[in-house]
Swiss-Prot record:
UniProt xrefs under Pfam families: EF_TS
Protein name per the record: Elongation factor Ts
Organism phylogeny: Bacteria, Bacillati, Actinomycetota, Actinomycetes, Micrococcales
Stretches for region Involved in Mg(2+) ion dislocation from EF-Tu: 81-84
Superkingdom field: Bacteria
GO cellular component, one term: cytoplasm
PANTHER family referenced in this protein's UniProt entry, alphabetically: ELONGATION FACTOR TS (PTHR11741), ELONGATION FACTOR TS, MITOCHONDRIAL (PTHR11741:SF0)
Membrane-spanning intervals of the chain: none
Described function: Associates with the EF-Tu.GDP complex and induces the exchange of GDP to GTP. It remains bound to the aminoacyl-tRNA.EF-Tu.GTP complex up to the GTP hydrolysis stage on the ribosome.
Cystine bridges: none
């Protein structure tokens, strides 16, 4: 049996992020050859990937970057445990994946997974890294936001974890500070749409039926129902439409007013939260 040094075990663990016991066994099987031991560990991990296929991925991170063409790309990369999520290997993996997807201009999961990452596709690269880390890793979402400018905000819900919430805003105008504060507002308020006109008609009609039934059950006069319903629909739009919302920093102002005062126009946004 080859004499396996502590230095070799340490070097391979630092390179791959594998456990002490698995690393030592692989080196012993490879007769101390670091390259062969790496292949053994990757093969073992690849076999484990199939077994992990049905596992849930409720942890992970959100990452985003501004591109040279006036767009920004954002991804949610998921894993099984917060232990892996906060590790340097997983964060480095997300950086490589994000760079590859942004360079390819991918806008869908299918395009993103097929994007080149060195000599591999993103899907192959993630699979290899999952094999090493010993967890299921999943590219869950990707978004590309366009604008004259873009503002990016990444929020940590815990100092020990990478960003769990990410927002990208496409906008026109010169007030970068207000643009960033709008991104922060979106991370907190979680609007689903930009304007009330963007809310699907079936969603509005469903809400209209609900508030109508609630108003009737409260004994409101039939003659007053139309006005009451419109008022309650207004409250609904404040929840789901960004421009209708009260500004998180000053609830006397709506986002629409803040944008007007700062000379900004928002063209679109995306918000990701890990596991949501």
């Amino acid at each position: 049996m080859a004499n396996i040094s502590i230095a070799d075990i340490k070097a391979l663990r630092e390179q791959l992020g594998t456990g002490m016991v698995d690393t030592k066994k692989a080196l012993e099987e490879a007769g101390g050859d670091l390259e062969k031991a790496t292949e053994i560990l990757r093969l073992k991990g690849a076999k484990g990937n199939a077994k992990r296929a049905d596992r849930s991925t409720s942890e992970g991170l959100v990452a985003a970057k501004e591109n040279a063409n006036g767009t920004a790309t954002m991804i949610e990369l998921a894993c099984e445990t917060d232990f892996v999520a906060k590790g340097e290997k997983f964060v480095a993996l997300s950086d490589t994946v994000l760079d590859a997807i942004a360079a390819a201009g991918s806008t869908t999961i299918e395009e993103a997974l097929a994007a080149p990452a060195g000599s591999q596709t993103v899907a192959e690269f993630i699979g290899d890294e999952a094999a090493i880390l010993g967890e299921k890793i999943e590219l869950r979402r990707v978004a590309v936001v366009n604008g004259e400018h873009v503002a990016i905000y990444l929020h940590k819900t815990s100092k020990d974890l990478p960003p769990q919430v990410g927002v990208v805003v496409g906008y026109a105008g010169d007030d970068t500070e207000t643009a960033r504060s709008i991104a922060q507002h979106i991370s907190f308020a979680n609007p689903a749409h930009l304007t009330r006109e963007d809310v699907p008609a079936e969603e509005v009609e469903s809400e209209r039926r609900i508030v109508k039934e609630i108003s009737r059950s409260e004994g409101k006069p039939e003659a007053a129902l139309p006005k009451i319903i419109e008022g309650r629909l207004g409250a609904f739009f404040k929840q789901v439409a960004l421009l209708e919302q009260e500004y998180a920093r000053d609830n006397k102002l709506t986002i629409s007013q803040v944008l007007k005062d700062s000379g900004l126009t928002v063209s679109g946004f995306a918000r990701f939260k890990v596991g949501a």
